[in-house]
Amino acid sequence: MKKTLLATAIAGAMAASGAQAATVYNQDGTKLDIYGNVQIGFRNIEAENDNGNIETQNDVFDNGSTIGFAAEHVIYDGLTGYMKIEFDDFKADEMKTAGRDAGDTAYVGLKGNFGDVKLGSYDTLMDDWIQDPITNNEYFDVSDTSGSGSSVVAVGGEVETDQLTYVSPSFNGLELAIGTQYKGDMEEENVTSRGNASVFGGAKYTAGNFSVAATYDNLDNYEVTQTGVDNKQEFGDRYGVTGQYQWNSLRVALKYERFDSDLDNVDSVNFYGLGARYGYGYGDIYGAYQYVDVGGDTFGNVVDDATSGDSPSDTASDRGDDTYNEFIIGGTYNISDAMYTWVEAAFYDREDDEGDGVAAGVTYMF
């Protein structure tokens, strides 16, 4: 389940507010909430086996069961400090034998008339403003530069760590954001002998039921080979634009996202996405379509490429001609205010149907 769906009452958090969070302390301007969920599902997916072949595989799995703590304290009128920490490596389907050795989100921040600033590990600006409006689903996701879905290029979860982000207050509907990710020379994942800071930022404009957002990240902390590091080769940039419109219970969003590669033998990738979600009273039904253009130059002739039927390539040298048509459909049904079920199906248009599958599950929130 996407982190933005978790229930929490902290005003400074990016997660949605919900009634399930339990306020355990609220006195003298200090508030502490405890919240969480148990998510268990079943999936049947075309995946690679130990021999490198694609075959149908299934299992009962934990879909991100989480427990979280959120606190805030009024420092003085117009300035509030806050923190949030979540743990989601519980493996609820194998609780008796599975270890718990990983967290999910942890940050501290200040918010007030000046805006909002926070430091720690959390969803990126690209995830919140660009990717989530298209597919904020339970399990399956379309491909993107963060590694979701059957992504052909991705930076992985490391991009969410060691972040410092400032978001301005709204100026007649306009919000501005700027941030950095810093990796010091003591970081294990730092392949250089010095500290390094990336730069990311964006803008979001809201007018009534319509909003549009644009973000950019120079990904300056990433490399793929030691040779690239030694030659001072750049990894590449990523950027995106998303527009969305909310009409009663229907939300429709359009996305353009691009990884602009500076690496030898690694192609740039364009992601063109369309997503919709409709609340029917007892839950949501939703779907998304995305056209993935590997090796494309900016927008290119998208319609012509999509209808020409470029097929996946077996070799990296030919992969610049690949295009994929991805589809995801799903729905939820609310059993109660705290419990719901869901079912999803995904089609990624990869060779041997890799990644295609169906999944269903149940979630209980508190």
From Swiss-Prot:
Which InterPro entries does UniProt cross-reference here? Answer: Gram-neg_bact_OMP, Gram_neg_porin_domain, Porin_dom_sf, Porin_Gram-ve
Entry keyword annotation includes Membrane: yes
Query: Which UniProt keywords are given for this protein, alphabetically ordered?
Result: Cell outer membrane, Ion transport, Membrane, Porin, Signal, Transmembrane, Transmembrane beta strand, Transport
Q: Which Gene3D superfamilies match?
A: Porin (2.40.160.10)
Q: Which Pfam families match?
A: Porin_4
Lineage: superkingdom: Bacteria
Cysteine disulfide partners in this protein: none
Broad class of the protein's primary localization = membrane
Per the record, the similarity remark reads: Belongs to the Gram-negative porin family.
What is the name of this protein?
Monosaccharide porin
